[in-house]
A protein has these predicted regions:
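Glycan-recognition and catalytic cores of secretory/periplasmic carbohydrate-active enzymes
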Residues: 22-413
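Bacterial N-terminal signal peptides that target proteins for export
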Residues: 1-9
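Bacterial N-terminal signal peptides
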Residues: 8-17
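Intrinsically disordered, low-complexity serine/threonine-rich segments
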Residues: 6, 21-22
């Protein structure tokens, strides 16, 4: 009996050791590849910048947010074989400049600093936009990264102005920031989990010298109310929740960009994982850490999560298109969360993120040439129900992929 128990203990130890070695091997392999990955990414973005710069100025585009003749690359039009340029008021217009900032951080090449400054500067009008929540995301990815990476206070006033503008979309009765629609809309008050990504700007501004702590209160309130109404008991995220402004209750749940109200849109789940991890970093409130873990456990433990870590565009749509952008956001969130968790839980999150980054860095997902306009990641899905940008590169996919690689590099040193 003793020999049998001893054999079982040794076998268990061997299995554990094998798992540890596999994890170490995967991390070592990715770490060894990092210089080459960053070099390829830099070459791609030099070419992308060269192609996009002549297209920066074009016809005046009229959007709800305003008029502008300035454009930023968003993706690649496969059918037309050309860049998809969007107005500076487009919700992802900060991601391309943000990727340039990350490449400057990754390589130290002054070229990327110069180009990041050029593309960032044209986005300043977003600080005054009141017609949606997206402008704050634009400003944080561009000017926010300029502040963080350059270590300057030059952009503090602009970021503070953006926070003030965003706060105008906050309803203190509901405790939420309106995502879509005009501030005066009495019929609908739409909120999406993507909104959590804006809270970082509020937290950063609240901590500036002389910063207004009201922004921290708004961010916490929005995070708390989103936690209460936007997720099922199993941790799956709902995309669109519409609130009644008279009763202060949920009046409708919509599938939005997801397959249905009872599944979880993969990128929406990723936004939420990222948002609550960030809120824990900024506030130290353990409720946000615990919730980030719950959301992450739902994603990485879902029976429909593919073995390579790149999710289908919706967790309820197995066998359909994968979404590389969702994987990139998840990987970045999981790496940060792993550092907070530590122990076995942290090791689990880190290992899954490494698997995702390894997959995204493979020829299946990483573009080796200019076939997708020199963007990095293939196979992104923006809005499947609407038939928009399916199986294509996406600017925010590249942005979070680079961010995740930088986080991994910092942890692996």
């Amino acid at each position: 009996m003793k020999n049998k128990i001893g054999t079982m203990i040794l076998a268990a130890a061997a299995v554990a050791a094998t798992g540890a070695f596999a994890k170490d091997d995967a991390e070592a392999a990715l770490k060894a590849r990092l210089p080459g990955i960053f070099a390829k990414a830099a070459a791609h973005y030099r070419a992308l910048d060269a192609a996009a710069t002549p297209l920066m100025k074009g016809k005046v585009a009229k959007m709800v947010e305003g008029k502008s003749d300035l454009y930023v690359p968003h993706g690649w039009k496969d059918n037309a074989g050309r860049l998809d340029m969007r107005s500076i008021f487009w919700w992802t217009s900060g991601n391309f400049p943000g990727s340039l900032w990350y490449l400057y951080k990754a390589t130290g090449d002054e070229f990327f600093k110069s180009r990041a400054l050029a593309w960032t500067s044209i986005l300043a009008p977003n600080s005054k936009v009141t017609t949606s929540h997206d402008f704050a995301y634009v400003m944080n990815c561009s000017f926010g990264n300029a502040k963080r990476i350059l270590g300057t206070d030059r952009y503090d006033a602009l970021l503070a102005e953006t926070a003030e503008t965003l706060a105008k979309r906050y309803d203190s009765r509901l405790g939420l920031i309106r995502s879509w629609g005009p501030i005066g809309d009495k019929k609908h008050f739409l909120v999406i989990p993507d909104n959590l990504m804006l809270l970082e700007l509020l937290e950063v501004v609240s901590k500036l010298p002389g910063g207004d702590r009201r922004f921290d209160e708004v961010a916490r309130s929005h995070a708390d109310m989103t936690m209460k109404h936007h997720f099922r008991a199993d941790g799956g995220a709902r995309h669109v929740v519409d609130y009644d402004q008279k009763t202060l209750r949920v009046q409708e749940i919509r599938r939005g960009q997801g397959a249905s109200c009872e599944t979880a849109w993969a990128r929406g789940q990723a936004w939420a994982m990222y948002g609550y991890t960030m809120m824990y970093r900024e506030t130290g409130d353990k409720r946000y850490f615990d919730f980030a873990c719950k959301l992450s456990d739902y994603a990485i433990g879902h029976p429909n999560m593919p073995s390579d870590g790149v999710p289908y565009w919706d967790f309820g749509a197995p066998g359909e298109e994968r979404d590389s952008s969702a994987a990139a956001v998840m990987a970045s969130a999981l790496l940060e969360l792993s550092g907070f968790a530590g122990g076995e839980k942290g090791a689990k999150y880190r290992a899954f993120a490494v698997k995702q980054l390894t997959t995204l860095s493979s020829p299946e997902y990483f573009s080796e040439g200019g076939e997708i306009g020199h963007f990095l990641l293939k196979h992104g899905v923006e809005h499947k129900p609407a038939g928009l940008k399916i199986d294509t590169p996406l600017d925010y996919g590249d942005y979070y992929y680079l961010e995740a690689l930088l986080r991994f590099r910092a942890m692996a040193r």
